[in-house]
């Protein structure tokens, strides 16, 4: 439960969202989304540990405005979630590239069923995102090295505690010193 609250606090950070100007929600209030999500989870037919899902939608640097990015994020969430799942959408403007975070409840508001996260649902999200970007004259960002990273891995890397990131940094620093594979 506290992990959900931490994720929501992170994506709603006023320093990243222009004092929460770029924070919106559907089917819940962003101020109490963790509590509202938990209420839905308590009513779910299927139980499980997954409280919510977290999507990150990235845009090429300098290609869009925060307002347009936020609107495209809303369109993506509305199309993918079809009005069934409450969500919080934020647009982060503090880095060199604008990006959206969409955290949505793992249980729908209509039949209290869990969201099915699999290769097909991921492909549907990608297709919808790519179409929306093209319709708005934006580049389609290809998945990079971060593809497939779990939230725990992403969070550890963000905090500087990722053993994978540390190992990669060490390897990157010694590769130029090598003259062969031996």
Language-model regions: role of each:
Residues 1-182:
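N-terminal nicking endonuclease/strand-transfer module with a His-rich metal-binding environment
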């Amino acid at each position: 439960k506290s992990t959900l609250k931490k994720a929501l606090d992170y994506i709603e950070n006023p320093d990243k969202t222009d004092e929460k100007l770029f924070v919106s929600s559907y089917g819940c209030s962003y101020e109490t989304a963790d509590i509202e999500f938990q209420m839905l989870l308590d009513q779910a037919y299927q139980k499980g540990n997954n409280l919510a899902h977290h999507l990150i939608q990235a845009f090429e640097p300098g290609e869009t405005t925060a307002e347009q990015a936020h609107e495209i994020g809303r369109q993506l969430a509305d199309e993918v979630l079809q009005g069934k799942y409450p969500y919080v959408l934020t647009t982060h403007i503090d880095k060199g590239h604008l990006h959206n975070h969409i955290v949505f409840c793992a249980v729908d508001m209509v039949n209290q069923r869990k969201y099915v996260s699999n290769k097909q649902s991921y492909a549907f999200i990608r297709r919808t995102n790519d179409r929306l970007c093209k319709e708005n004259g934006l580049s389609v960002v290809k998945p990079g090295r971060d593809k497939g990273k779990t939230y725990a891995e992403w969070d550890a890397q963000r905090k500087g505690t990722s053993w994978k990131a540390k190992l990669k940094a060490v390897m990157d620093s010694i590769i130029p010193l090598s003259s062969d594979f031996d």
